[in-house]
Every structure is written in C-alpha cells, then in structure tokens.
C-alpha cells in the first residue's frame, strides 16, 4: 500500500470516528431531552394530583363550616382564612378560597324577579349603577349594559343602545356575539365600548358563574367592594355610606337579609327591589390553588357548589406555566 492509499484509509477512519462522535452526541442529547420531558410530565402530573388533593380538602372545609353555620356565611369562618400554604415532599401548595357570591354574576344580567315588570331587569340596572360607580358616564354605562345583555341572550335582535353581530363584524378582525352565557369574565373585553382601563376596574366586582342566578352575600363583601353594594340599591345609597355599612359590620355578619335591610343607612332607599338579589348565606365558592415545584407553577381554579350536605366541583380550570431562572 502506497502513501496515498494509506492517507485515504486514515482519512476514512477519521471520518467514521467523527460520524460516530456526532451520532453519539446526538443520541446523548436526545436521551437527555427525553428524560427532561418525561421528568417534566411526571412533575406536572404530580402537581395536578396535589391540586386535586387540596381541592378535596377545600370542599371538606366548606362542608364543615356549612354544617356549623347552615344559615350564615361570613368572613370569620375557617374557609375565609387567607394565605394557606402546605409543604409537600418536592414543592409547596398555596390555596385561597373566595365567596363566589361576593360578586356580580354577569350571566344574571337578563334575569327578572318574581314580581318584576320593569322594562329593564333589575340585575341590568345594578350593572349600570356599578359602571357609574366606577367612573363611567351614564350613557356609556347604559350602552355597555345593553351590549352585555345582547351578548348573553339567544337572539340576534339588538336592544336599545345594544350591539349584535353587525356591530362586531364591522371590526377588524370581525367576530360574532356569543349569544350564550359567558364562559369567562375575559369575554367582557370583546363588548362594544369596553376598554382595558374599565375592564381592569370591573374585574374585582364581577364573575361569570355556571348559572344565571344572582344572590350577593352582604356578609362577605369587603369594604373595598362598596361600589357593588351601593349599586344593589337605587342612587340614594352613596359609596361612602355603603363603605361605612360594611366597615361597621360585625365579624359574623348579619343573621338575615331582614337584619341587614333594617340598618339606618338603608331606610331612605327602596329595599324591596333589592331584596330578592341579596343573601347572607353562600353555596358557591371559588378555590384557587398554585403548586410550586422547582421552576414550574401549576394553577387550578375550581368552582365548588353545595350539593345537599357536601360540596362538589361544577367547574375546573387549570394550567401550567414556567418561571425563567434568575
């Protein structure tokens, strides 16, 4: 074998070695990636089960409070404790329970009371007053209320000041009205006339529950939600009076709606219209769980509703997100 042939043979050996190294590196990288994906999947599954376990504990806690106080729900009960944190083997669970009846149910906007004959349903009047209490001009508040009513009703006929498909299809890109109950509060951003600033102001006061009922629990409304309490009544109840009423509330709240309506600040207003939409007892709660495992965060939001003597899940939303390393 001459020098030229030996050189070619050596070159081929080197090429084969290089190819083997590339393949080995690729296989190692692929194996590491598959291992990481498997580990992440297992972590996510474990986090989900942690959240479901915490959900079961939340339901049991609500059940115990309901048995202890079947006719009242208030902020001195165990469920209302904030900042719950549980340590598990490889992470932490953060849990919060809030009253789903301490907000305005947007899906109740078209509901009417048993004896109500007004042209505009009382919940729609409440929503209009809430918008005004949050700084909206009266005309804009009326337009947004009508737009929401059109969005959740099942017809294509616009109300006075309302908006149906033709209004939204004229936008770019165009879209159609829901013509069904809201699935999430974020749908408000799609309403004609809604902007980001007003939407952010509204968020603490509203919810989109799985049914169309409205029963605002005056025992669990925080003083900083006085705008909603004032909106439940005609304009005679001011924001200042509503806030003072909530601040003066006993730790265990009012024993009945009648006891609440007997407060001096409410004697100057028409309480009969608001009465059907008030409560001192809640049967629906929102439990929010955050499971922290390394850099991963697993979020779950469960709507729990009283079903007989226990609480069951009627809606559950969950997701996973990652936090970048510092």
Curated annotation (Swiss-Prot):
Post-translational modifications: Cleaved by prepilin peptidase.
InterPro entries: GspK, GspK_central_sf, Pilin-like, T2SSK_SAM-like_1st, T2SSK_SAM-like_2nd
GO biological process: protein secretion
Residue ranges crossing the lipid bilayer per the database entry: 8-28
Ranges in coiled-coil conformation: none
Localization in the cell: Cell inner membrane
Prosegment residue ranges: 1-7
Main location: membrane
Keywords: Cell inner membrane, Cell membrane, Membrane, Protein transport, Transmembrane, Transmembrane helix, Transport
Residue spans, topological domain Periplasmic: 29-326
GO CC list: plasma membrane
Family indicated by similarity: Belongs to the GSP K family.
Subunit: Type II secretion is composed of four main components: the outer membrane complex, the inner membrane complex, the cytoplasmic secretion ATPase and the periplasm-spanning pseudopilus. Interacts with core component PulG.
Purpose: Component of the type II secretion system required for the energy-dependent secretion of extracellular factors such as proteases and toxins from the periplasm. Plays a role in pseudopilus assembly and seems to control its length. Interacts with the pseudopilus tip complex that is critical for the recognition and binding of secretion substrates.
Name this protein carries in UniProt: Type II secretion system protein K
Source species: Klebsiella pneumoniae
The gene coding this protein: pulK
């Amino acid at each position: 074998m001459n020098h030229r042939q030996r050189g070619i043979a050596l070159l081929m050996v080197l090429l084969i070695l290089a190819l083997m190294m590339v393949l080995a590196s690729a296989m190692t990288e692929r194996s590491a990636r598959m291992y990481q994906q498997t580990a992440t999947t297992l972590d996510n599954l474990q986090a989900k089960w942690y959240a479901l376990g915490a959900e079961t504990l939340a339901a049991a806690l609500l059940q115990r409070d309901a048995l202890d106080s079947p006719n009242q729900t208030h902020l001195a009960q165990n469920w209302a404790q904030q900042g719950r944190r549980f340590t598990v083997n490889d992470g932490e669970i953060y849990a919060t329970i809030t009253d789903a009846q301490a907000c305005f149910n947007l899906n109740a906007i078209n509901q009417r009371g048993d004896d109500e004959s007004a042209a505009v349903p009382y919940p729609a009047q409440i929503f209009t007053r809430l918008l005004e209490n949050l700084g909206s001009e009266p005309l804009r508040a009326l337009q947004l209320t009508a737009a929401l009513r059109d969005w959740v009703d099942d017809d294509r006929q616009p109300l006075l000041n309302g908006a149906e498909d033709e209004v939204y299809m004229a936008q770019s890109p165009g879209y159609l009205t829901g013509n069904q109950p809201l699935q999430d509060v974020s749908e408000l951003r799609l309403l004609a006339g809604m902007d980001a600033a007003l939407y952010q102001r509204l968020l603490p006061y509203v919810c989109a529950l799985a049914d169309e009922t409205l029963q605002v629990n005056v025992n669990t409304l925080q003083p900083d939600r006085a705008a909603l309490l004032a909106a439940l009544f005609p304009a005679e109840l001011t924001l200042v009076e509503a806030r003072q009423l909530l601040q003066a509330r006993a730790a265990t709240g009012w024993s009945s709606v009648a006891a609440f309506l007997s407060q001096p600040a409410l004697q100057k207003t028409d309480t009969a219209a608001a009465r059907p939409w008030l409560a001192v007892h809640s049967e629906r709660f929102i439990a929010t769980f955050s499971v922290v495992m390394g850099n991963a965060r697993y979020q779950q939001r469960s709507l729990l509703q009283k079903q007989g003597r226990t609480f069951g899940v009627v809606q559950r939303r969950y997701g996973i997100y990652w936090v970048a390393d510092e």
